[in-house]
Amino acid sequence: MNIKDLQEKIEAVWENRHLLSDEATMKAIDAIIDLLDRGELRVATPSDKGWQVHEWVKKAVILYFPFRKMETKEVGIFEYYDKIPLKHNYEDKGVRVVPPATARRGAYLAPGVVLMPSYVNIGAYVDSGTMVDTWATVGSCAQVGKNVHISGGVGIGGVLEPLQAAPVVIEDGAFLGSRSIIVEGVRVKPVEYKGYVPARSVVIPGSYTKQFPAGAYQVPCALIIGQRKASTDLKTSLNEALRDFNVAV
């Protein structure tokens, strides 16, 4: 099937779930997950008009769960019990993975990606040179650009439900500070101001005053305190030694 055929198949199954048991449906969904896994298909793609979300691809990911059966997976001394297979062949993909980091099938990891003990969910796209640091989570369908540093404990939200939600987009060169939480629909880019953060911004937790019927209250927000300077870049520069697979760290 070509992409157009796959899209039409998914839209038909989405409207009629009885088709889920059809062998052709299973093959179509599996083909889409395989394309996502190889980075040949994405849940969202950049264009001249901004980011375009492909809802039918998100639908395919959701439909992948019902026809998958729970099964035990043994990885060395560890045991998992889940529906979604794990990614494998990291050496061939040029991806460095530190135990016990986990990435599900259907997530794309480009050559040069480094996973410290972290988690990457199905539908996510992580581009080259990006490091996902310890205990960080890249949620379902999140789109992460090149040379991004996702610091320890960062949570990037997933967006399989509600279906209309736009995925988190982290564009090239961003540095996400430790324990940041980035939720669905937020775009961190190479410039907001509502829903996305301007390029080279320095952001801290803040609040603003919002008027409610009961009075004025402080509401949490991302507070932009300035732009990155040379000194900021020096402090947050990517350590190439950590990205050289032949260097012991």
Please report, for each region that a protein language model flagged, where it lies by residue:
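Structural signal for interior beta-strand "rungs" in well-ordered beta-sheet cores
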Residues: 91, 95-212, 224
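Terminal amphipathic alpha-helical/low-complexity segments used for targeting or macromolecular assembly
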Residues: 1-95, 200, 206-249
